[in-house]
Every structure is written in structure tokens, then in C-alpha cells.
């Protein structure tokens, strides 16, 4: 794939302009034909009446002597055989049902695809364009589950990408992805016409690339011992031979692999391997890091304090590392991170302070700018360009540096106005470790919800950028941080189907994007994901069951009014009440959209496309007294002034789905909202001790310690608020992290509907306590106790 340059971005713009002038084709904003299985949507599509039927044995003809076209055609035939069971034969020269042609002009990634009764023609001037034409044809060939011959619609497509950088970032430092999984992701990216795979190869928790001159970077830095010692060792790395193979595999799919080695911060794994290149706080030049010890490779997520030193020896080490990086990676851009570099070690080091003084620098931010400038100059001497997260703006940028903006879009705006190229990757719109919905069945991750529509609605070019500055927007990138993504299944759940929305934003023109037209095509993409074995989330289409008026009202009335819906408002919802699996022939909702159900009820529901295809897995909801009195972790609220920011697993390195818990790292406190307390005699809490493995840096002092009455602490239950009457104090047993706890206690008699505050008083330097579910249990008739009861009698 050609290097990303301003010239390439101009070619993208020129291609789109040329397509706009092609009067024979439909305008971009014209209504999209129904259910064409194309994602991303092309720049121009014009229906052509009768289409083409492809039978087994149909020929793909490529220009004589065009080895690259033959390779692309062979790959297309292999994909169609894999996903359709239709065998196509590639031949050099002559006629064919499918013909590859070289256009005489046009940008290398633009293409035309014509499907007529006489055959299909794919034409482009460059290899990338031919490849993307093949992707579009493959999508049309695999629009449904039918195997064998396919009837293709008649149409003419003229297409080119809007942006030159259409990227996806995979963090392999926090959790390592084997080569086979990365190759699977590369193939999935190619199917969406994404063209940059950004690999986050180093962080505090692991160093993932072999550096032959410094073998301890992987012998030591690639491995860690998780909290609790299970497994005894976790990690992995890529040899240079493996990485070259990955790069070649990606290049065949017109994807550039961009490496990231984080510096000067997020350096703990490297410093664990070579402490002499960390910061000498003691000031005596001894080969050690931190306060007179070699750190372990971190098991804590978040922000850790370790930095690279800024002496000549440490800079030579980084240059040696970069020499091997540029020998492996042909990409123009080398990502150096630059984010979240706490300056505490630099501030505490006499040697670093002397270095700052000798350089005439007045702040540690200025020192980071000097550091980045030095690395940028070195990369420039190797013919490469530096790119880093938007923190590298602090203190000034090297002249040829580019910025990847994650803290919103302000960094991109500032850099573009300074004349620097930018890539947009804002956390609020493109960080795919945020959960796809607020459903109970979402796996671990950040609790900040990132629904697919927010991805689709993201616009990379801010309206306040004028045309000259907008030309510096190279594109955008979705980022998958993997603290809570330890397996391929969870990786695919996090990425798909949001990658489809990302691809359309990155490829299609702004005017061509249409959410309502995207949804039917997304349904076809979801069905294809299932056939391919991709573990895509169905959160967007899954039926959500909500009790209208609240659970307390349903308990009082002995019946529940429920609303059935899904996140995207697409499909027809059907349900059953007899335990059977809903089908396209099951009951539909009344006009009000509400169901009134006597207690108890067992509701099963799903959404269906117009052709009767289920859009998700059916969801089951029991609506009875026990369920209405239970709050899962996901249904508990944060205590006042708090925030439930993470959805954590029971075991940090579990490679499969595991129990998950919504937690506030700063305060182990939850609110059970609107509890109906009439007749309640007992509270049962399913709790857990989790690893407290999240680096809070300077915020660690804000963690709340509630006073304890026993060595291991208690779970307190307060009425109304966290300062209300103490209803129960459940003593915690001794134990360690990754344990589940079953806690129960009688409750004194109370009436009405009130909140309950539940908070742990355990030592904040030990495990993190969390709640899985809280159940209120009705007392046997005549067994409730009046308020108040002495707290001691409730333990």
C-alpha cells in the first residue's frame, strides 16, 4: 500500500471530485437501493436493470501478464468459494463472466464496478482499486446464506475512499493476540476496506516485539504474573519473522501495519527488562529504576509512573530499538505514544533536573517536547514520520510530526491549524472497549456506553476547520484497548458490528451516509458475520424489556406493564409467554407498544427483519416477585458524587466470559434504587473480591475508606441514603481476591419505597469488593421485626 501522504489525500479528494462530475451515474445523495449488501456505501451507485447470474466454473479474466491483478482475482475467487461455495476460475487474458481491467488514469484506490447481463467488469488504475472492487463484488456475492450460484443485481458503481487513513488500533500489550487472531482481524478489516492496522506493541503490562539487540525486552518484558498467580505467567510476543509475515499478509490486503512503542511514559515493562534505561531517582547513576529496585512488569491497568530516562545512554537505547523497528515495518509512520506520561520520576531525579538545566528547559512538559523532537528527528533521518497521541502537543511539536487525537477533537483541531497532519480517534466516539449497550448481558469493559449510532454519526472534519486546514485530516481510527478484552471472542464482540459503522464513516462521503439506509445493510452484514463465525455483538438489535412505572409499582399491583424495544428501533418485535422460542409468526406488540402481564410471567422476545430473519438471539425475562425484588450489578446506581466507571471480571486473565461487576474504583458504594420494603425480612447479597489492579496515579488519594468495625470489614446497608439508618452490617470473612461471597442478613421491618445504600468498609489497600446482585427476600407471615434494631444484633 502506498505511504500516507498529503499527495495521497489530494488523490482521494480528486477521485471523489471526478466521480461527482460523472453525470451518467447517480448522485451520491440519491436514495440507496434496498438491501444491497455493501458496507461501506460507495460514492456512486446506479441501478442497471437486469443483472448477472454466476454459475460454478465461471471465469474471472485478468489482463495478460498482470501478476498483481491475477493475485487479487485469485483471492476474490477464494473468498467467494469460502463464503458462497461457488467455484470461480481465474484465467489470464480472454473473455470471462468477470473481467478485471486496468484503467488508464485515476487514483490508485478508486475503482469502477459494472454488473450487466453480459458480465461484471472491475476496473482501476491501481492494485488497491482492483482489490476494493473485488471486495464490493464479494459482498454482493455473499449477501445471503444460499450456497452455489448467485444472481447479482445489475448496477454501476464508481467509488473511491474519502480518507486515506481508515484505521483500527489493537492493543496487544495489555492482552496479547496470537498471530492467528491478528490475521483473522486483518482479513475482517480488508472486508470493510479499512487500510491501517495500528498495533500498540508496548505498555506497562508488556513488550510484544522481539528486539534482537535487547533480548530481555521480550524474555522479561513480555511476561507478567497476574493478581492471584493464575496463571503463573501470562504474556507473549512476536518474533521479527512473525511480524514480517503479518505485515506481508496485511499488505496483500492493502493494509499498512503501523507500530506503536510508547515513550517516554507507559515504560514499565521496558524498565523491568532494562532498569538502567529508567529514571535514576537516587541520583547516583546506579543501574536501577524507581526507588532502588527493578520493577516487575505491571499487572495494574491505568496509569503507572515509569518513564524512560533522558540521558544519552537511554536515548541511544531507544534509537537502537527504533533501528530494528524500521527494519521490520515499512510504514511511513511510526507511532511513539507520548500519552499519560506522569512526570513524577523526572521531577524527583537530580540527574534529570540537571539535564533540563543544561538544555535550558523550564518544565517537564518542555522536556517531553524535547524528547519527542529528538525521537522525531531520528525517525526523519530514517525516512520515517513520527505520530503520537495528542499529549505530544504539550510543549510544541516537531515540524513533521502528526497527531492522533484521543482526548476529544480539540487536539486534532489545534494540530491541523498548526499545519500538522492529524488522525481522529476520540475516546467518546471511537474507543471500542466501551460497552455496546447498557444491557445486563454485556461483558467486561468500560461502562461508558458507545452505541453503534454514535460511531456512525461521528464526523472527522469539524465544521470550524477551513478548507486549507481540513486537508490535514488524514482520517480516523477506532481503538480497542484490551485491559478487559482477553480473548478473540471478546475482541470480536467489542469490534463488530461497530467496525461496519467506522468503515462507512472512513470511506463514504458525508452526504452519502444515511443511518436509516445503513440499518438494512447492517442486518445483512450481521448475518454474514454469523456465517463466518465472527462473534459480533447483537446488542443493537436485541430486545430490551423495561418495566414501565418501576418495579415497586408492579409489586404493589401484582402485575407489570412492560415495554419491548431495541437500541436501534429496527425490526418487528415478536414474543411468547409459554417459554417457546419466538419466531416471525409469534405474537406482535399491541399498538401502544406495551404489554400488561399478570405476575408471574416468563417473557421471551426477539426482533425480526421483513423476511422473517431473526436479528439477534432471543432474550428471556422472568417477571415475578423474586425478579422484581432483585437488582443485578448493572441495575444498581452509583452513590452520590460517585461514578460506576468499570465493568470488571472476577478473574483478570480469564480468557472466556466470566462473571462481571460494575464498580467505582474510588468508592465501593452502590444504591439499590426504589426498594419496596413492605414485608421484606432478609437481604441476600452475592458479592466478590476482585483484584485491585488499576493504577490511579495521583487520584489514588481520593479513594474513600469507610470506617470498619472488624478486621476484614463489613457490608453496610443503610436506609434512604448512605447517612440513613443502619439496617444491617454483614461481616466479611477473611480471604483474598478472585473470590465470590454469599452474604445474608435479616432486615428489620420497614414500609414504603426507599433507596438502600450498600457500602463496603474493607481496607482499601486490599482486594476491591464488588456486588453481583442484591435480593430482597419477603419474610414469612408474621416474622418481620420492627425498626429500629441495634446494629450489633444484625451482624
Please give the residue ranges for each predicted region.
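Bacterial N-terminal signal peptides
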Residues: 13-24
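Extracytoplasmic
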Residues: 618-795
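Contiguous, structured surface segment used for ligand recognition
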Residues: 30-165, 490, 502, 506-532
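Flexible, acidic glycine-rich loops studded with aromatic residues
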Residues: 386-401, 407-560
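Short, compositionally stereotyped local motifs that mark structural "simplifiers"
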Residues: 29, 61, 513-650, 691-696, ...
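Bacterial N-terminal signal peptides that target proteins for export
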Residues: 2-15
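Feature activates predominantly on carbohydrate-active enzymes
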Residues: 106-333, 374, 378, 477-480
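Active-site neighborhood of glycoside hydrolase catalytic domains
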Residues: 296-400, 406-414, 418
